């Protein structure tokens, strides 16, 4: 099976060491452009752009990078409860049109109650997934060209529709990750790609089986992807030394403070990540060549594949054998590591060919929209 491999834009910061200002790097537009162009040239299929209060806005970053890239796709966040699904559909179609079909969307329900409260979203875990399901239903239908009336528990819309369709038909694919039962139900019902963080293969196998069974019960099929960091070097010994260096400046207080902050999250996935390392710097190889050191201070994806090119490729194949076809990778610092992955890992992978998109679909000549609702029709001939 050929693999899709994405990279990551570190809009929340970058550097040579975790949890330290030493070796830190200024992340400005010029730097993000360097990473995006490197990923584009090296053959990555796309880049994940993170979301949250610690990040630059993912939609604006993606839009700014369209003119300076050629084939790279942009995986940006949809935030149910923070934005109208109708407006989100319109924005999604516009981004897809401006990028000529290079827009992908990642449904993010959120897991930090403090951050969500600051955004004006005051729903508990169960309610957020209810609202996310309603949001996704409306968003999908509007993007697919339907006029939607919906009266849900959390969201109500009347006459929601889209005048300018996306390039990708019937709409751009939707990605989503979540480990709770509610998240798996949502994935099985409405998304194309279910994402998991980099847990050991045995745990990933269980999650895939659960989501696959739930999707089959609804008459659907779902693809699977995984989010991992990677530390690849010419030798496995060198890679492990690089892993040790990455956390060399972490002290116990920094780790404890980070884990205390993560403990307030109601994200099941975050809880599963924390359980892999227990907040300790020892015994971080939790599965062959799978290292949990990143998660000591980083929320979300907290594990890395560590080794030389053939070794990391072999571990990726183990996940592929479970049904994973998309790998969203990252590494510190992200510019240098993109090149290391391209040069040391890609030669050992069977990659999906990154083909240029089809020619841009022109907007149909129509005149100005009447009253923000109606597209002018050709006058009848009497």
From Swiss-Prot:
Keywords: Flavoprotein, FMN, Monooxygenase, Oxidoreductase. InterPro entries: Alkanesulphonate_mOase_FMN-dep (IPR019911), Luciferase-like_dom (IPR011251), Luciferase-like_sf (IPR036661), SsuD_RutA_monooxygenase (IPR050172). Its EC number is 1.14.14.5. It catalyses: an alkanesulfonate + FMNH2 + O2 = an aldehyde + FMN + sulfite + H2O + 2 H(+). One of its GO terms (molecular function) is alkanesulfonate monooxygenase activity. GO terms for biological process: alkanesulfonate catabolic process. Pfam families: Bac_luciferase. It is an enzyme of class 1 (oxidoreductase). It comes from the Bacteria. Belongs to the SsuD family. Homotetramer. FMNH(2) which is absolutely required for this enzymatic reaction, is provided by SsuE. PANTHER family: ALKANESULFONATE MONOOXYGENASE, ALKANESULFONATE MONOOXYGENASE-RELATED. This is Alkanesulfonate monooxygenase. It comes from Serratia proteamaculans (strain 568).
């Amino acid at each position: 099976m050929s693999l899709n491999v994405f990279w990551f834009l570190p809009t929340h910061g970058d550097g040579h060491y975790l949890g330290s200002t030493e070796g830190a790097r200024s992340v400005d537009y010029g730097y993000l452009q360097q990473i995006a162009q490197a990923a584009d040239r090296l053959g990555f299929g796309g880049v994940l752009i993170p979301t949250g209060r610690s990040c630059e806005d993912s939609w604006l970053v993606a839009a700014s990078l369209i003119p300076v890239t050629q084939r790279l796709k942009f995986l940006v966040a949809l935030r149910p409860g923070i934005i109208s699904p109708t407006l989100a559909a319109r924005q999604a179609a516009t981004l897809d049109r401006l990028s000529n079909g290079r827009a992908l969307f990642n449904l993010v329900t959120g897991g930090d109650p403090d951050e969500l409260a600051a955004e004006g979203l005051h729903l508990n875990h169960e309610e957020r997934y209810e609202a996310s399901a309603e949001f996704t239903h409306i968003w999908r239908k509007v993007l697919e060209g339907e006029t939607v009336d919906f009266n849900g528990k959390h969201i109500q819309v009347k006459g929601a529709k889209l005048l300018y369709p996306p390039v990708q038909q019937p709409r751009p694919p939707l990605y989503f990750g979540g480990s709770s039962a509610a998240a798996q139900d949502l994935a099985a019902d409405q998304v194309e790609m279910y994402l998991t963080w980099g847990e050991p293969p045995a745990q990933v196998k269980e999650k895939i089986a659960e989501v696959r069974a739930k999707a089959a019960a609804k008459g659907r099929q779902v693809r699977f992807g995984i989010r991992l960091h990677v530390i690849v070097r010419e030798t496995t010994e060198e890679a492990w030394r690089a892993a040790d260096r990455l956390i060399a400046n972490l002290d116990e207080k920094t780790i404890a403070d980070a884990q205390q902050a993560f403990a307030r999250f109601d994200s099941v996935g975050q809880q599963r990540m924390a359980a892999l390392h227990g907040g300790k710097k020892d015994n971080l190889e939790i599965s062959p060549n799978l290292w949990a050191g990143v998660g000591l201070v980083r929320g979300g994806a907290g594990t890395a594949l560590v080794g030389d090119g053939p070794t990391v490729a072999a571990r990726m194949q183990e996940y592929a054998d479970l049904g994973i076809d998309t790998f969203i990778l990252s590494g510190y610092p992200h510019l240098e590591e993109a090149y290391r992955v391209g040069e040391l890992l890609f030669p050992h992978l069977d990659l999906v060919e990154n083909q240029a998109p089809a020619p841009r679909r022109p907007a149909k000549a129509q005149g100005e929209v009447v009253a923000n609702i109606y597209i002018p029709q050709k006058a009848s001939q009497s």
